């Protein structure tokens, strides 16, 4: 859709490529995080498919945190070890680091309430989370679509990259 392509292109200064879409069917109550830790160079388009409010788990963001420090996999490597699950590594190592950056930034968190069909665009460095769901079991359908610039050399996965024209390419990482 040109309605999404144009603002993404304007933000990137380059053509966007889709790299991942996730469907949240209820509020996630996800810890604070930065998408670029997982998806280098990304920007997110969070599309509400239902009304999103405090009852069903609003998106929470720290305004201005996209200008702050990015936690990278060099800072906090998560490895597949038998002694500790990936989820435990995030809980014990990654999320506490994000909380430190959150405090460094010094800005308060705000809730984002949206109507069905609204799109929230945000930088992949923005610290965000899912708020507590007040009405358990209430639906909160949202798509979290992640994009990177066409020229991105920082993409570290062998996933397909799909343009808004439907062209699919895989830019394989080097083994260097």
Predicted feature residues:
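Conserved double-stranded beta-helix
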Residues: 1-62, 66-68
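Extended, compositionally biased low-complexity polar/Lys-Gly-rich tracts
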Residues: 8, 109-113, 143
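A short beta-loop-beta micro-motif enriched in histidine and acidic residues
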Residues: 31-42, 107-108, 114, 138-139
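Short, conserved beta-strand element in jelly-roll/cupin
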Residues: 38-54, 113-116, 121, 146-151
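Short, function-defining helix-loop hinge/capping sites that tune catalysis or transport
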Residues: 41, 58, 71, 131-133, ...
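Glycine-rich loops and low-complexity Gly/Arg-rich segments
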Residues: 41-46, 69-74, 84-88, 145-148, ...
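Double-stranded beta-helix
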Residues: 54-127
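Non-heme Fe(II)/2-oxoglutarate
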Residues: 75-78, 116-121, 125-176
């Amino acid at each position: 859709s040109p309605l999404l392509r144009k603002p993404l292109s304007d933000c990137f200064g380059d053509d966007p490529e889709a790299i991942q879409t996730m469907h949240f069917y209820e509020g996630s109550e996800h810890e604070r995080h930065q998408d670029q830790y997982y998806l280098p160079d990304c920007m997110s388009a969070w599309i509400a498919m239902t009304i999103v409010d405090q009852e069903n788990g609003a998106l929470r963001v720290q305004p201005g945190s996209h200008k702050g420090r990015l936690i990278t996999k060099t800072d906090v490597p998560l490895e597949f070890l038998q002694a500790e699950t990936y989820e435990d590594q995030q809980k014990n190592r990654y999320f506490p680091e994000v909380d430190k950056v959150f405090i460094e930034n010094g800005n308060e968190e705000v809730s984002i309430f949206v109507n069905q069909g609204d799109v929230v665009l945000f930088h992949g460095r923005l610290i965000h989370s899912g708020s507590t769901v007040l009405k358990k079991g209430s639906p909160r359908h949202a798509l979290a679509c992640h994009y990177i610039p066409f020229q991105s050399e920082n993409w570290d996965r062998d996933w397909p990259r799909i343009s808004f024209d439907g062209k699919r390419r895989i830019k394989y990482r080097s083994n260097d």
